[in-house]
């Protein structure tokens, strides 16, 4: 019971509350979906170290298999670099820029809708309050009766929609800002990893046959 009314009566008497209910369901759905996507497509420094260890040993096939097994934006960036490692650094940088932009779009998917729901829920709550106040004063004018207690009750019922709208809007806005910042941070991290990969690939291309032979000998020595 809220203000002497059941939830059914509250939603039955206010179309704005019904709209807010649907908004809350939509917002919760988007938050859960984005949380799952970010968790599934996270970045790990362990993966970066492991991949670059393959490059240091000159194990291209091992690096390719490892990158393909990641099934993440990091793995897709690594594969793109390996498949185009013979390109000039500037060309490879442009490829990485396009790939990272594509990944960022995926991370930011549905965030526009989440932001709209956060602001829309608050405004809907205010609309419900205004409509409720109009109805309360209109009923008082028609009946010709109503003391402070009656007016206060009508205002309290009208303000309920504002409270519900804020209850939806504030958490949704928090998650919107969190996911937006997270998407930006991941994009910057991918850019940094991409730069490191370009340097590593270019360094391997500059090795002379004699240097490659010495590296193979060192690898065999340590394996022994």
Question: How would you label these PLM feature ranges?
Answer:
Residues 156-174:
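Hydrophobic alpha-helical transmembrane segments of polytopic membrane proteins
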Residues 31-34, 139, 175:
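Hydrophobic membrane-targeting alpha-helices
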Residues 42-127, 131-145, 177-224:
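Predominantly long cytosolic amphipathic alpha-helical stalk/bundle segments
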Residues 14, 28, 63, 78, ...:
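Residue-level signature of catalytic and energy-coupling elements of molecular machines
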């Amino acid at each position: 019971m809220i203000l002497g009314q059941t939830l059914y009566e509250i939603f039955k008497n206010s179309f704005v509350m019904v709209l807010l209910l649907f908004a809350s369901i939509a917002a919760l759905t988007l938050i859960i979906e984005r949380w799952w996507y970010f968790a599934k497509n996270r970045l790990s420094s362990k993966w970066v170290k492991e991949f670059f260890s393959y490059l240091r040993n000159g194990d291209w096939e091992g690096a390719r298999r490892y990158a393909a097994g990641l099934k993440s934006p990091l793995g897709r960036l690594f594969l793109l670099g390996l498949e185009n490692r013979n390109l000039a650094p500037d060309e490879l940088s442009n490829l990485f820029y396009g790939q990272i932009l594509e990944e960022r779009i995926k991370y930011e998917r549905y965030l526009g809708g989440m932001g709209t729901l956060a602001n829309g829920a608050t405004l809907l709550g205010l609309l419900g309050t205004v409509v409720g106040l109009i109805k309360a004063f209109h009923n008082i004018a028609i009946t010709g009766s109503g003391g402070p207690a009656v007016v206060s009750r009508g205002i309290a019922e009208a303000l309920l929609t504002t409270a519900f709208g804020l209850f939806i809007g504030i958490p949704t806005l928090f998650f919107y800002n969190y996911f937006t910042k997270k998407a930006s941070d991941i994009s910057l991290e991918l850019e940094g990893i991409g730069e490191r990969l370009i340097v590593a690939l270019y360094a391997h291309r500059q090795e002379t046959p004699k240097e490659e032979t010495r590296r193979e000998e060192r690898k065999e020595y340590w394996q022994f």
